[in-house]
Amino acid sequence: MSDLDERLRRRAQKGILRPELRVGVVSFVKSYVAHINLRDAGNPSGTHFEGGRYGKGEVGEFILVEGQRSILLGRIMEVRLPDGERQIIGQDYAGSNELDAIGHIQLLGSISMVDFHFTAGVDLYPRLGDRVYAAPHQLIALIPYLMIRTGDGDTPVQLELGAVGDANESKVSITPEKLFGRHCAILGATGGGKSWTTARIIEECIKHKGKIILLDATGEYGEFS
């Protein structure tokens, strides 16, 4: 059994829909968009679970919607209050469980309840009242693997590029075919980690004895051999 299969087995044993990470319920559904009522958005901070921090309603957080036949993966793109309740948050606001916040979700893909295989797009749209959970960091880290996993025991070469959050076992790996199969560009602001990311990719390719043609005008990567 490969390391990725072992990580998936442990995650499956623990479950991917954890009651400790429940975020809210679906209140509105549209093509590739859903709104959820956030039950913990009024709390002054998030929560820690299995070594990682979860906002439970913060912008950018990945979430799971418990559907009838599959689990939907989404991401919180916006959090707001109804216009009539905005005055609740004043200069002395210290948190409240009664805050009626709404999260706007972009639906990204579907996860099979049988083998956790991930496919882009929505197989079946959620229903009003479906429960929503923060996605465990370990599951998000396995998404690239779940898109190509065949179940025949043959694990392809994986380039380890980083990690999701600060949880254990949340390292993200991707196959060279997925990374280099089409145009690949590393973009970001100054100090955003472009050079580090490039160096990481080169290191991983060298580790797996990959062949690279490197045009290094500034000599930044001259120490690689």
Give residue spans per PLM region.
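Conserved ASCE P-loop ATPase motor domains encompassing nucleic-acid-directed helicases/translocases
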Residues: S2-G153
